[in-house]
Curated annotation (Swiss-Prot):
Name of the protein this chain belongs to: 4-alpha-glucanotransferase
Domain of life: Bacteria
Keyword annotations: Carbohydrate metabolism, Cytoplasm, Glycosyltransferase, Transferase
Keyword Glycosyltransferase: yes
Catalytic activity: Transfers a segment of a (1->4)-alpha-D-glucan to a new position in an acceptor, which may be glucose or a (1->4)-alpha-D-glucan
Family of the protein in this entry: Belongs to the disproportionating enzyme family.
Enzyme class: transferase
EC number, UniProt record: 2.4.1.25
Subcellular compartments: Cytoplasm
MF GO annotations: 4-alpha-glucanotransferase activity
Record bears the keyword Iron: no
Stored Pfam families: Glyco_hydro_77 (PF02446)
Originating organism: Chlamydia trachomatis serovar D (strain ATCC VR-885 / DSM 19411 / UW-3/Cx)
Chief site of localization: cytoplasm
Length: 527
């Protein structure tokens, strides 16, 4: 493991040293929470963009410097933030209705807003109701904006021109998709899959295109407001940019030369999943992306840097190679030859890392070749360390001491794809007993408040530069702040289609978090 001084030398020799110099290498503490999980008294059934403003205030008051969120791209009728229908467009579900000018002129606005706000009291996010009620409200609100000439504002036209690379294709795709009742692309009539007929469709759906474009303009306005507040509070927002995209996305429809839908991407068999995983997501054609100088990727990063200071590069190994499933169910690595996948990864990293002002943090969990890890380190790209999984798997299985983590990393006790710390402790008694012995803590079958607090403290004292935990693991210090139903506390169970995936709601409102003096004092004492 390199020392901090060695890591600093790596940083200064890297192409992203200027970005690192802005962030600096002093320890950074943070909290991770999906936006959909948050709510305030004004939220309409789901976490909204402007909810991040009081959330930032809470983070700073507790001593956190980083607020990490999951992807906030438009997911259409899907709830998974990692299965979006656009790699760039934001999800209008997160628009803060209470902040929209002239909202009161929408018919029955007060009653409708109150009904949507009541959905925030449900123990889980109810996407179907929220999506339906917000969609109807936005349609009415758009008509109000048209009457007020807000859609004729020069700023809106400037936004459409600035973002034309992705905005117009997205708005047209959205319009066609809704016209076809959200049919998958492979069931669309050929008239809509034939891109040579786009001009005709643009005329047909002109009003719908402007509607979806205007919603994106509002999303942009609200998220830039969040970023400005974060800057004022010296809080770093860490976004999440997936490598992959839904097969039923605008990108696959419009930029089809960048993707192959005949095979799908997943994960190979490992210690935790003997059969591997098929994510049913299309493969990126890296050669075509390279020929276009990675324009698709660069546009994604350019737009995201309006909102984030750092970003989680999901499944970073995919820049080097994918685990590919063919139609018969057989899997393979592509490219397979280390010489080829290292050359591919080096080329794309050298282009992408300097095209953005954001600091990348790689999600390098799972089966990652050692030569890929070394190359990421040479680019000064941080990796991810999950203490329960950091073990000498090739030897005696001993846990890795917390002070032996690579400084170029982020430590997190749990992820959105794992159980919470308390659930893992209870569900995996053999592992948690070894973990307690490793940490010198007394073992009990249920994670005690003492052990929970000590493990959180230790996670904020690892040798990683970044120490960021799920909000669930902090709130569990107070039983009244979490659900009595354990499955409600888990964000996602990979490889499953479940009504409990991606519906996690933080039990206390942000107002309640802010006023919980005991929790806030305890969190402040962790660092």
């Amino acid at each position: 493991m390199p020392s901090l001084s060695q890591s600093r030398r790596i940083i200064q020799q890297s192409s992203i040293r200027k970005i690192w110099n802005q962030i600096d290498t002093s320890p950074k503490h943070g909290v991770c929470v999906p936006l959909f999980s948050l709510y305030t008294q004004e939220s309409c059934g789901i976490g909204e963009f402007l909810d991040l403003i009081p959330m930032i205030d809470w983070c700073i008051s507790c001593g956190f410097q980083i607020l990490q969120i999951l992807p906030i791209n438009d997911t259409g009728s899907c709830s998974s933030p990692y299965n979006s229908i656009s790699s760039i467009a934001l999800n209008p579900l997160h628009l803060s209705i209470s902040a929209l000018p002239y909202k009161e002129e929408v018919p029955a606005a007060e009653t409708r807003i109150r009904e949507m706000q009541q959905l925030s009291q449900l123990p889980q996010v109810h996407y179907e109701k929220v999506r339906s009620m917000k969609r109807d409200f936005f349609q009415e609100y758009y008509r109000v904006c048209k009457q007020k000439k807000l859609t004729d504002h020069p700023d809106f036209y400037a936004f459409c021109e600035q973002e034309k690379y992705w905005l117009h294709p997205y708005a047209l795709f959205r319009s066609i998709r809704e016209h076809l009742d959200n049919l998958p692309i492979n069931h669309w009539p050929t008239t809509y899959t034939d891109l040579s007929q786009i001009t005709e469709h643009e005329r047909t759906f002109a009003e719908d295109i402007q509607f979806h474009s205007y919603l994106q303009y509002l999303c942009f306005q609200q998220m830039t407001q969040v970023r400005e507040h974060a800057n004022c509070k010296s809080c770093l927002i860490k976004g999440d940019i997936p490598i992959l995209i839904s097969k039923d996305s605008c990108d696959v429809w419009f930029y089809r030369h960048y993707f192959s839908s005949s095979e799908s991407v997943g994960a190979p068999p490992d210690l935790y999943n003997a059969e591997g995983q098929n994510w049913h997501l299309p493969i990126c054609n890296m050669k075509t992306l390279q020929q276009d100088n990675y324009l698709w990727w660069k546009e994604r990063l350019r737009y995201a840097e309006n909102f984030y200071s750092l970003y989680r590069l999901d499944h970073v190994v995919g820049l080097f190679r994918f685990w590919v499933w063919d139609e018969s169910g057989c899997g393979r690595f592509e490219p397979h030859d280390p010489k080829n996948y290292l050359a591919q990864g080096q080329d794309i990293l050298s282009h992408l890392l300097t095209s953005s002002s954001m600091l990348p943090i790689g999600e390098d969990l799972g089966t990652i070749p050692s030569d890929v890890k070394r190359m990421l380190e040479s680019f000064a790209v941080c990796g991810t360390r999950i203490p329960r999984w950091e073990r000498n798997w090739e030897g005696n299985g001993a846990y890795t001491p917390f002070d032996q983590y690579d400084p170029l990393s982020v430590t997190s006790l749990s992820t959105h794809d794992s159980s919470t710390l308390a659930s893992w402790w209870k569900e995996s008694p053999q592992e948690s007993k070894l973990f307690a012995q490793f940490l010198g803590l007394p073992y009990s079958s249920t994670l005690s408040l003492h052990n929970h607090t000590e493990i959180l403290k230790l996670s904020h004292k690892t040798s990683s530069i970044f120490r960021i935990n799920l909000i669930n693991d902090y709130l569990a210090l107070f039983p009244d702040l979490i659900s009595k139903t354990p499955r409600y506390e888990r964000i996602n169970l990979p490889g499953t289609i479940s009504k409990n995936n991606w519906v996690y709601r933080v039990k206390p409102s942000i107002e309640d978090l802010s006023s919980h003096s005991k929790l806030n004092s305890l969190l402040e004492a962790l660092f």
